């Protein structure tokens, strides 16, 4: 009987072993298929080699991370963009678009535009003249301007942020939107589902019950898209009545007002935009809204434009683009510099193209400056940024660390007439994984304001010198290099 019991158990053990073997073979096959996919789709040779090798030899460890981090294009968004563009074209057919054409033609005559011709082809948006722009330094000025515009809204409010918090600032925004919705204003509120993961459901429900159309931007539509949590909508946009728009680095939370240690005071920059280019901000928002809801917000053009003003171009970028628009944007701005290029970013994890552009600018005799934080909000990213900063110093770039608090602004200044403000960081995440938006302005007056702002920031910063580079301990350098290994997904 004992032998009979053993005989009964033996097939069961063999069956379990067979299933385990089939599972391992299946994972190995999936790893091989994913490796082929990586070779065909990953945009950089280094990334393709790294993913393909690990997927072939360690599929049990790397298959799931590849589904999350490895895919560099948000394919489902591409089709949503096409459909949104078709519907926007129909909606815009009855509007008078002649000012767009007239301003685009006028823009080509501006001298500062000549060095940035590639931007138009990269972004699908025209370069438009006769815009009014205003620099908004730090949170108090930025939110005061945004809240004032929202309070005066008559028709439509578009709101988009990466992070929204249910704190004093978030509740103030909530109350303003509820008041405008109660007065018949259409309000559309888009937030990133991952960036705002801590936002309580009650915050969203109160707005919805008050008539605000509020949705989270998520990649969860479709089987494979559920794994694409690495793609985030990092844009910060507010548009009121199609007349004025706001873009920059601020999210909605009291830390952006400098009220949350240990990173306080918080250093950030926004800008206000009025004129034809606001329509491009509406288009960017509409594409994102269509992905989240399969519907479009109203498109509004003001009855007339100013007869003079600044040249502006909205540069919206993301993983749905055919090329790395954000990386190319920075390369184009750096290459356009003849006298100087000053860049400020909370993170400095550049790709090879941007590093090469910085080196070439130094060799051309351009004053190349980089302003980064002296305090980390993400230690791994900070370590990787520090290593790249050391390499930049070796190439002749002047690197400064902002001392008073955390520096979060994303600003580029080129020569005496060109500046850009927006949401894009100087890192791989913004280059290839995030949806970002920058506004390029060609105007000597605005560039002068940006220059004065950055000069004040440099005055409160310490330059990172070659002596500092030599004083970094070997253990610290090892940590920096380990951080750089994972920089493609930071």
Curated annotation (Swiss-Prot):
The keyword Chloroplast does not apply. GO terms for cellular component: membrane; plasma membrane. Keywords: Cell inner membrane, Cell membrane, Lipid biosynthesis, Lipid metabolism, Membrane, Phospholipid biosynthesis, Phospholipid metabolism, Repeat, Transferase, Transmembrane, Transmembrane helix. It comes from the Bacteria. CDD domains: PLDc_PaCLS_like_1 (cd09155), PLDc_PaCLS_like_2 (cd09161). HAMAP family: Cardiolipin_synth_ClsA. This is Cardiolipin synthase A.
